[in-house]
Amino acid sequence: MGGFVLAIDQGTTSSRAIVFDGAMRIVGTGQKEFPQIFPQSGWVEHDPDAIWDSVVSSIHDALARARITAGDLAAIGITNQRETVVVWDKDTGKPIHNAIVWQDRRTSAFCETLKRDGLEATVTTKTGLLLDPYFSGTKLSWLLDHVEGARARAEQGGLCFGTVDTYLIWRLTGGKSFVTDATNASRTLIFNIAEHGWDEELLALLNIPAAMLPEVKDCAADFGVTDKAVFGAAVPILGVAGDQQAATIGQACFAPGMVKSTYGTGCFALLNTGADRVVSKSRLLTTIAYRMDGKTTYALEGSIFIAGAAVQWLRDGLKVIGDAAETGRLAAEADPGQPVYLVPAFTGLGAPWWDPDARGALFGLTRNTGPAELARAALEAVCYQTRDLLDAMHKDWQNGEDDMVLRVDGGMAASDWTMQRLADLLDAPVDRPSVIETTALGAAFLAASRVGLWPGMDAFARAWARDHRFEPVMDAETRTEKLRGWRDAVRRTLTAG
């Protein structure tokens, strides 16, 4: 057995591969971006072959930088963008359509029809989710209805459905493994999180044939072995989790009441609720945090669709910055007397508002508003939305401790200005870990602990290390005024008024 573990982190805009050694140190990385496809307003797609090519390229780069070969790997862990739908031919492996991405809103009208028919309560009771285009089920139904012959082929067992993890495992194993894990399954809108299986009633509701669904496993399990012809060596795939659940694991949020927030393209906060499957009264999601040895740990999740993507918009859309790294410096230079609010509802608003038809808006603009004020507004929007999520979580689940500490990760967590403003607006400490690649770390832990290369959960939690703690310094009056302005801006953006 080799002494290294490979984490594949397949994201929304790029794929990453990270090699860890037996001491949990990063020894090699690779990253490859791939194109985003926008066929219509509100539609977002990926070419599955482009996803695959980016994964292969990043793996080759990571192994080369680690100065090892595939044969030196003890195991592979996979983490991935969730909810994104891929459908492919079981015999040829060829996708029948581009992947429909989690950000895609094309099924908004279908979701509204189902809501009007009074079906959301049934969906939420079974899945912990809401009837929103965000999740996989309505996307899959759309594909079956709009790709010629797809439904008949699916009913005959000729098509495979998967989230991105399933598609990658299929290709890595040369088509031998058709599997997913409980966390990815829990995001599909057709998986019953209480009974731990695909739900016949929901499949009938969305007219999805059960024959096209993968087997669901624990997060740490035997997912298959890579095909030597594809990968260069036969390496076991032993860990899989959706990206936000993998980050929860990588942050060692194993105790009920612990909460983490990941800042990438979107922002996602998860609160560990242990064995307690909390029914949210604040339109948060009840989801599976992880499933180990057949035991399910649940979480409350709040999903923000636009976080780092707002900074990309400043760079690529408005062209007011040249590089994302400039944003924090610019924000620090903003005029404190000019309160500008950005509500980044570019693809609707997520939790706790769930308004798919809301669109982005800027408030408070004057003739003196410039790039600095826009940069501050973009970064503060992420902080305000996080505050909304955590307020809703604590309203739903009273078992958490009053002295909450938020563990953060993702690209935006590297910004000292943003993390300080986050602590200020939360009125709570924010901890940034020493290993910022927590999503990949979580996937690596699942695989490495199963193969015996790394320790178990207790020892892993003790090894978690903090890089920096940001303590709140903003006075209560300023914080209250800023939050009031934000909530007024959101209210004016919502389509319901």
From Swiss-Prot:
Reaction(s) the record says it catalyses: glycerol + ATP = sn-glycerol 3-phosphate + ADP + H(+)
Residues binding ATP, per UniProt: 12-14, 265, 308, 312, 411
Pathway: Polyol metabolism; glycerol degradation via glycerol kinase pathway; sn-glycerol 3-phosphate from glycerol: step 1/1
Sites where the protein binds glycerol: 82-83, 134, 243-244
Sequence positions that bind ADP: 12, 16, 265, 308, 411
Positions that bind sn-glycerol 3-phosphate: 12, 82-83, 134, 243
S-S pairs: none
Keyword Nucleotide-binding recorded: yes
InterPro entries registered for this protein in UniProt: ATPase_NBD, Carb_kinase_FGGY, Carb_kinase_FGGY_CS, FGGY_C, FGGY_N, Glycerol_kin
Example of a GO cellular component annotation carried by this entry: cytosol
Keywords: ATP-binding, Glycerol metabolism, Kinase, Nucleotide-binding, Transferase
Domain of life of the organism encoding this protein: Bacteria
One Pfam family named in its UniProt record: FGGY_C
GO molecular function: ATP binding; glycerol kinase activity
PANTHER family given in the database record: GLYCEROL KINASE, SUGAR KINASE
Function: Key enzyme in the regulation of glycerol uptake and metabolism. Catalyzes the phosphorylation of glycerol to yield sn-glycerol 3-phosphate.
Similarity field: Belongs to the FGGY kinase family.
Protein name: Glycerol kinase
Source organism per UniProt: Allorhizobium ampelinum (strain ATCC BAA-846 / DSM 112012 / S4) (Agrobacterium vitis (strain S4))
